[in-house]
Structure formats: C-alpha cells, structure tokens
C-alpha cells in the first residue's frame, strides 16, 4: 500500500458538521491537518432539516462562536429566516433558530475551509485505522493508499454500517444517495470498541409549486436575530422567506393506523432506537392516540430551489403509503414528492470508552465526535468537533486537554453527559439538561467562554476585546444604576429596582430616565436587563456552584482500583470501573452511583492522599 508522502498532526475522517469544525479549529491552532471525505460536494451537507439552532441547540451554536468556531458564521451567511424561540418565556430558554439555504451553507463552508492555511481537504473513503495496538498512526483508504498522522479524529456521522429503510425495503447507505462505510465498524470492533445501534429519520421533500399555501398559517422571521456575537444590529445578507404551518387530518390518522404493519419501525425491521424528541409520524399517532391532529411545518430548503422540507412528517412507511399520507395533509392534496422519507440505522460507540476530551480510552490519539458518540443534531456534532479538534492539537503539543465544565457551558453539559451516562436513545441537547441554565443564556456565551477561545488561538484579539468590553460595560452600568436613586411611583428607589419590575424593559428605562441611563445599544442593553432582572436567582446559582466546586473538581487517579474499595456497592464498583470518571463530580452523575458511594470514594481518596 502506497503511503502519502506528508505526515499530518491531525487527520479528520468525515466532513460533516463535526469534521468541518474539528479540521478548522485544529488548523487555526497551527496544526497540519488532513480533512478526508468521501465526497467533496457534500461537505457540511444538511442531511435532514434546513435549519440551525433552536432550544438548547441555539445556545450551543452561540458557544461555538464564543470559542472561535465557524458554525455561527456560516449560519449567518446562509440564513434565509431568523427567529427567537420562546420569546414569551424566561431568558434561560430563549434561543435563536435559522432556516438556511442548504446549498449556500455547503458552498460557504467549503470556501472557508479551502482558505485555511495548513488544512488539506482530500476526497477519499477511510477504510481502516492504522495503529500499533496502543496508539493510532493514521488511516488507510478504500482507494488503496494510506495517510499517516499523530492523531486521528473520527466523525463518521450516520455512515458506519448505515442501513436505510423505506417500508419493507432496506439497503446500505450513509444517507440517501451516499454509500455507507463498512470497514470502520469492523476495525473499531477489532480494537475492542463496544458498538451500539441507533436510528434516525428524515421526511419527504416536496415541490413548493404543488402546495396550496393559502390554507396554511404563515410564519415569518424576526428582526435582529443572529448567531455571531455582534455589538451592532444584524442585517441578513440574503432575502428572507417565511415558513408555513399546517396539520394532519383524520384521514392521515386512519392511513397510518391501517398501515402500521408496513412501517419499518413497527414492522420489527429496525433494530436501533430513535430520538424520543423527534419522533416519526407513525410514532406520534401511536403514542398520542388521543390527539386528532399534529402540526406540520413547511420549511424552504433554499432560495434557488423549489424543494421544501416537511417538518413533522418523518416516516419509514413504504413509498405508496407516504404518497397517500402526504396528500391527506391540509394544503398538500396535490403535492409532488421530490425525495422520499426514510429511516436510517447506524453504529455508534458507547460513551464509557471515551474521555470528556473526546479521546478514546482504548487507542491513544484517536478522538471521536458527532453521531458516532450517540448524539443527534448538527449543533451537537459541531460542538464535539471543536472539542475533538482542539484536543487533538493539545495531544500533539503535549498540552492538557480542554474540557469546559457543565457549570459554565452547554458544551460542558453534553461532554459530561456523554461520558457518564448509558445512552438508550440518540442524545439531543435541551436547556433542561443544565442545572444552572440561567447562567448559561445564549446572550452571554461570549462573556462566559471567549477567554478560552482567545487563549487557544481560535478567537481573534479584536473579537475577544469586544466581549471584554461588553462584560465591563454591563458590570459598570449595573454598579452605576444601583447607586442612582430616582422617584418611581410613590417611593425613591435605585434604578436597578425599577428595572427589576417585570413590566419595565431596558428600552423603557432609557426613555423614562434618559439623563441617568447609558445607552448600551440593543444587544448589550438586553443582556444588562437580564442580569439585573434575574440578579437574585443568578446570585443564588453562583453561590450553589461555589459550594459544589469544592467536591466537584476533586480528581480521581487514572490507575484507581475500584474493586479494591470493599465499602463501595457492587454496582458502584462495576460502573465506576466501566466509565473511569476523572472527577468526583463526574462520578456522582453516573446512573446508579449513590450519595453513600461517593462518600466512600472520597474517604478512600483522602486515605490514599495521606
């Protein structure tokens, strides 16, 4: 086998959302990087919905931007509708979401990656890892040659032994139109990796000109919503479009009920478990039998195509049943299908063999990110890609790994969850997964995390200075307003107390007391308002975190023998040995580990220390 004459610091396998972020970040840190993908024309392809962000997910994209990653930038360049979800709810759960032009998203990502110094993008299909039994050495390809590298980042998406289901038909594929990767799964098994099987799905695509939008509810976008942190108002570069909302009918319900036995999911042909919070339409009909109808969202796939995505109508039914189901939906009576819906099963690696840095515990220098770790979603994948890319370079440079904590980021919540929990379904980020979500708002991601991005060499000094200035402005104005007393109603109170009232906004305060309130602009002003309005809750959460940190960050030696600690329960010994947590905090979050087990472990660690 011929070996390519260049040795790389980092080899990234797969150019989906995880792989693109990993390759970009590694190269920006000064590493020589190979990004290996089976098809250059599908770089950063949005395989499912034409959207980025949402509740929890939008928070992650803002964190990626704060750390110096690229998903936010590409989303803003490609966005054809921007919205803030949960506007009427509390600030912790408000989140940006964008409809993007799928073709432009790919084009912008490919163009950006091609301009990064030190990054070599190459078409080729990874077939097997090269290793010496302890350390990864590179990768061999289906085409018959090899690449050598000091580290390898594996971001295979749904391609590992991918199996596509449409009714009773199934065939190999990484997604519809692309071949599956068969060799990598076998190679990981050879190396001792425990593999599981998960499932996801995507709905049919329809021709917009065949849809009756007049019977649907129009859903326009919002103004001044974006993913890249800015001081100024955001004006999209592309024309903005609307989505539309329709619903299923009694006929839809009857069709699905009568044909359940023909569904790949209910016919017993699918082995993998699907995402609970993104169910197929047949799942909804079965599990919510009391509901007469379900909402369907019609989302445009781009400005230069008539194709639309039918959000809420994912299915693994046969194509003839899909045809009837679609035409039973209000406004879709004459719809023309351009691509069928399908379900896909794929292999993933269990989290107990992965460190929070995303390095494998079994083979040194091998990092895993994205759906191979059991997650679902572009945003979760991109965040893991950033972490894996950064830590692959840290490995080469012999620097300690970068692992943000769950107290300071949603990315940290995800890393901790993936490496301490047994997944029984694809992992999706929600704000409810974070214990301190009021501290992890989407508006303050830059103030929370930009110092990491700057120290890693990913975030420019100019952008870091912007975040520092925003933070300083908010702290100074909070202090000033707390000392500025004015009459409001019948009493004289500090202006911070006025802003704490639920009916008073920062803009109203600015209008009513123009001589006393500094105009920080709409972006920083909104953050100031949240910091003041929720200061009591924020202070309590910060106090709780400080009290927990004393035990949370106690390190556990890598060579600890849990089976020798007889006071631990049998379940605790087995699970701690399986997951090998690095800290007491991580150990405490493993399912089945009791408070008593943690107390025993801490006593044992103190004895060993003495």
UniProtKB/Swiss-Prot annotation:
It is found in: Cytoplasm. Its cofactor is FAD. NAD(+) binds at residues 274-288. GO terms for biological process: tRNA methylation; tRNA wobble uridine modification. One of its GO terms (cellular component) is cytosol. One of its GO terms (molecular function) is flavin adenine dinucleotide binding. The keyword Cell inner membrane does not apply. Its main location: cytoplasm. Keywords: Cytoplasm, FAD, Flavoprotein, NAD, tRNA processing. Pfam families: GIDA, GIDA_C_1st, SAM_GIDA_C. The keyword Ubl conjugation does not apply. Coiled coil: none annotated. FAD binds at residues 14-19. InterPro entries: FAD/NAD-bd_sf, GIDA_C_N, MnmG, MnmG-rel, MnmG-rel_CS, MnmG_C, MnmG_C_subdom, MnmG_C_subdom_sf. NAD-binding protein involved in the addition of a carboxymethylaminomethyl (cmnm) group at the wobble position (U34) of certain tRNAs, forming tRNA-cmnm(5)s(2)U34. Homodimer. Heterotetramer of two MnmE and two MnmG subunits. Belongs to the MnmG family. This is tRNA uridine 5-carboxymethylaminomethyl modification enzyme MnmG. The gene is mnmG.
